[in-house]
């Protein structure tokens, strides 16, 4: 049996914090990968993963269908559209393929795609993820809002399966862990009723 192979892009952040103390200030930097929570769980299921943290996506994310073909699925998580659109050469006024269109075409050709929600997914915080009205939105089963899509729920909420017997939920709990936020999207009319 062929091992499932995915390209997982995102779920990392470089953080700059400035401390202002009257007339004086200092800045310190840190780096974190929230991918450390999900990637081991996927690997436990026998999934082979090639991981690109956010800062590597601009230069290293595939530019051609041939580079995407080895993957059964591409996953983006907390990764805005600009990281996919702006290859470093584009910033030097050289053309490169539109990777949002490439991902759309990859899905049309039968490749899997999953966008995991986050502050830089779908529309995102202050609409900075900006996937509304892009080629990649055409491949999603939902419409991305044209404005900040966050629904913040500090009290927490638990999603429940509407149809726990649906095949896509095989092996998942009927009640999901508590979440504090989600990206609001609209199910495309041609997709029909959501099952989760």
Segments and roles (model prediction):
Residues 7, 23-130:
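Helical hinge/lid and interdomain linker segments adjacent to catalytic or ligand-binding clefts
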Residues 2, 11-20, 35, 108, ...:
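An acidic, glycine-rich "communication" segment
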């Amino acid at each position: 049996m062929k091992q499932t192979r995915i390209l997982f892009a995102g779920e990392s952040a470089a953080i700059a914090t400035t401390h202002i103390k009257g007339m004086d200030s200092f800045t310190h930097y840190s780096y974190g990968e929230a991918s450390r929570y999900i990637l081991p769980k996927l690997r436990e299921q026998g999934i082979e993963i090639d991981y690109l943290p956010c800062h590597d996506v601009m230069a290293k994310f595939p530019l051609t269908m041939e580079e995407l073909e080895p993957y059964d699925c591409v996953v983006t998580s907390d990764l805005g559209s600009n990281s996919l659109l702006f290859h470093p050469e584009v910033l030097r006024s050289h053309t490169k393929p539109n990777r949002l269109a490439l991902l759309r075409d990859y899905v049309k050709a039968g490749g899997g795609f999953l966008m995991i929600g986050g502050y830089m997914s779908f529309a995102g915080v202050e609409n900075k993820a900006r996937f509304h009205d892009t080629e990649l939105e055409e491949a999603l089963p939902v419409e991305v809002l044209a404005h900040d899509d966050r629904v913040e729920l500090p009290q927490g909420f638990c999603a429940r399966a509407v149809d726990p017997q649906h095949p896509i939920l095989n092996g998942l709990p009927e009640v999901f862990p508590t979440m504090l936020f989600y990206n609001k999207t609209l199910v495309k009319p041609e997709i029909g009723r959501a099952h989760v």
